[in-house]
Design a protein with these regions (language model features):
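Cytochrome P450 heme-thiolate monooxygenase catalytic core
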Residues: 121-127, 163-337
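Conserved cytochrome P450 K-helix/beta-meander segment immediately N-terminal to the heme-binding cysteine loop
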Residues: 395-398, 417, 425, 430-458
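Short, small-residue alpha-helix embedded
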Residues: 334-347, 487
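Conserved cytochrome P450 K-helix E-x-x-R motif and the immediately C-terminal K′/meander segment
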Residues: 64-82, 369-417
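Cytochrome P450 I-helix active-site segment
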Residues: 225-229, 234-241, 296-301, 344-396, ...
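Cytochrome P450 heme-binding "Cys pocket" and the immediately downstream C-terminal segment
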Residues: 213-214, 350-352, 460, 473, ...
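N-terminal membrane-proximal hinge/A-helix region immediately C-terminal to the signal-anchor transmembrane segment
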Residues: 2-147, 161-162, 166-180, 271-274, ...
Length: 530
């Protein structure tokens, strides 16, 4: 007997599903309109439509910046705020989604702090980053995120940050590499950027794992014969290259928005494998250490490293690996790029450099003996230089959150932008830290200029968030600022002058997970005469 009725039933089910979905969306829209009306919310302006539907042409420009020479921030994003004359607007994403974009501190405060529970990282971020970082503090929400943050927080006490022995060794290694190329009264031109990445890698691995990878000396061929084969294999310059490739791929996945999965391939997979090998090396060391008695470990080391602490909580090697890679991303890349921009600005602004060097001499003398967390904080011009660098070049210039429920932003809607903006559950809000840090109505007409003096007597508020804010504020911000300040002091103590020898003009920005000087940091140093 022929089952002639089966296709008809199937077609009916399909129609019913479509009708149900449309009806559900209709009811959902009515509820959202009532929600928006209850809060007095109005629509913000929409960005001008692109030449192609769904913003395809804009996404193409984002992905083609290397070939076109356009700057993602200055040429593609900031002009949209300027065209509309507003600090909050709505744009259309690649898959047709309605995206809110803002550089208003009141809205950013609402997202990150006031209405924190209304917002989340979201599943897309996890899928964009998860191939490399797995499930960890930067890719999780809710109780899972709270768990990971709780594990990491104890490492970032003032006592631990003030333990600067590993930082001093990393400084000496960097200075040693610079001085090798010395010629007459000046060193040869050197690109500081890769050296700074190795400095932060060496310092971070000491801080997190209790042992430096010695990447600076290994890369320069200056490491001692006593370094083990495992050190040379697992901690070599190859990791730097692999991590850079992973960072670039993750950045491309962000630009592709909902089509992030298109950014993949054998080269990316190989880089991920290399980065994971690096992390797995340390996981195995930590698990081996954990197999010893706690008493024996206490006799061998003054305190547990963070990884050893994590190993007390879980013996799952995948979870440990994910936490390591997240910490390395924050501890290495963020600090290295802060230092890269700082040295670039100081080399190009010799008067500020001279003032800073004089203050360092007065405060710290010629050696590391008096450098502590407290003394670094007490040197005003040193802190002002770092604050100003992060204002102009926040290492994470653009970030976002996803609405976990229907919610509102306090301003940006209506004809004059004074009304609230209603945001639907699942909607993305991009917040532009770079743009907010350069708003002339906040910072003055010289907002684009490097002027550390502007920080004298100025208090930090929501106009300035280089380390984010609210409950998810960067745990390692004091660690990063201390590492950066320490190296600045030691370099300016060692070398009487630093001169810019790179390309003049507007600095080109490179975008991975963080923002870095695309052309490197090309300088030379004068040598101290006997």
């Amino acid at each position: 007997m022929a089952l002639w009725w089966v296709p008809s039933i199937f077609a009916l089910l399909v129609v019913l599903r479509i009708v149900f979905s449309e009806l559900r969306e209709f009811v959902r829209n009515i509820h959202f309109q009532r929600f928006a009306k209850a809060y007095g919310a109005e629509e913000p302006p929409r960005s001008l439509p692109g030449k192609l539907p769904r913003g395809i042409d804009r996404v193409y420009r984002l992905l083609n910046t290397r070939n076109s020479g356009e700057d993602v921030l200055d040429d593609l994003i900031m002009p949209r705020f300027k065209e509309l004359g507003r600090n909050t607007f709505v744009s259309t994403g690649l898959l047709g989604e309605r995206v809110v974009n803002t550089m208003d501190p009141r809205n950013i405060q609402a997202v990150l702090a006031v209405n924190f529970k209304d917002w989340e990282i979201g599943t897309r971020r996890h899928r964009q980053f998860g191939t490399v970082l797995g499930t960890a503090i930067f890719t999780s929400d809710g109780a899972e995120w709270s768990h990971f943050r709780g594990l990491a927080r104890p490492q970032f006490t003032r006592e631990n940050i003030n333990d600067l022995e590993g930082t001093e060794k990393a400084c000496r290694d960097l200075i040693r590499v610079i001085e090798v190329d010395a010629s007459q009264n000046w060193t040869q031109p050197v690109n500081l950027r890769p050296l700074l990445y190795r400095f932060t890698l060496d310092a971070a691995t000491t801080f997190f794992f209790g042992k430096s990878v010695n990447s600076q000396l290994i890369a320069a061929g200056m490491h001692e014969a006593g370094l083990s084969a495992n050190d040379s294999r697992a901690l070599s310059e190859d990791f730097d290259k692999a991590w850079t490739e992973c960072s670039e791929w993750m950045a491309a996945r962000i630009r592709l928005q909902g089509l992030y999965w298109l950014s993949n391939g054998p080269k990316y997979n190989k880089a991920v494998e290399r980065v994971r090998d690096f992390a797995n090396h340390y996981v195995q060391l930590a698990l081996k250490s954990h197999s010893q008695s706690k008493t024996e470990i206490d006799l061998q080391t003054r305190r547990f490293s963070l990884l050893e602490g994590l190993a007390q909580d879980t013996s799952n090697p995948i979870e440990l690996r994910d936490q390591i890679l997240s910490l390395l991303m924050a501890g290495r890349e963020t600090t290295a790029n802060l230092l890269s921009w700082t040295f670039l600005l100081l080399a190009q602004n010799r008067a500020t450099q001279a003032k800073l060097r004089a203050a360092i001499q007065d405060t710290f003398g010629d050696g590391p003996e008096s450098i502590t967390f407290a003394s670094l904080k007490s040197c005003a011009i040193l802190q002002h230089v770092l604050l100003e660098t992060l204002r102009l070049y926040p290492v994470v210039p653009l970030n976002n959150r996803v609405a976990a429920c229907d919610t509102v932003l306090p301003v940006g809607g209506g004809p004059d932008g004074s009304k609230p903006v209603a945001v639907r559950k699942g909607q993305i809000c991009n917040f532009m830290v770079y743009g907010m840090h350069r708003r002339e109505d906040i910072w003055g007409e010289d907002a684009a200029e490097f002027r550390p003096e502007r920080w004298a007597g100025r208090k930090l508020d929501w106009n300035y968030i280089p380390f984010s804010g609210g409950p998810r504020v960067c745990l390692g911000q004091q660690y990063a600022l201390t590492e950066a300040a320490y190296l600045l002091v030691r370099i300016l103590q060692t070398f009487p002058d630093m001169e810019w020898v790179g390309t003049r003009g507007k600095a080109r920005k490179g975008y991975g997970i963080t923002m870095a000087p695309a052309g490197g940091v090309w300088v030379r140093f004068s040598r101290r005469t006997p």
